[in-house]
């Protein structure tokens, strides 16, 4: 699997099973993860553990995967930037289902491995709405 977008999509398929051990075969040993809320993490299993504390279960509905034309600096380093864009669906810890929760993930792929992963989604907003502190 040489295409950076294919690598990211397979990583996401595995991490959403969840199978962070298998997903790790697509990550560099020194991978840097910045999860929602600016939480630094070291490996895919950290993401799975965090998601287990926030959701009963969660999956991604990938709407598109975009490989971005590299900047001169990224190209010189052999990096490809990939964005995965879509929505989350699943159940909150109390069993209430949700869907349509937007996400954007940014990945850097080098030599067939993911070296950086940044994750954003609307879950915090949805939690505020459920608490009666915001309106969507």
Task: Give residue ranges: language-model regions.
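Short acidic-aromatic low-complexity motifs
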Residues: 1-26
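Short, solvent-exposed coil/turn segments at beta-strand boundaries
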Residues: 75-79, 107-114
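Short, surface-exposed coil-to-beta transition loops
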Residues: 62-64, 98-104
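Low-complexity, intrinsically disordered terminal/linker segments enriched in charged
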Residues: 116-136
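Generic short beta-strand segments
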Residues: 30-32, 85-91
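Short, cysteine-centered beta-strand-loop-beta hairpins and adjacent loop/turn segments enriched
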Residues: 59, 89-99
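A solvent-exposed, acidic/Ser-Thr-rich amphipathic alpha-helical stretch
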Residues: 20-80
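Conserved hydrophobic/aromatic beta-strand scaffold that supports enzyme active sites
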Residues: 83-85, 104-106
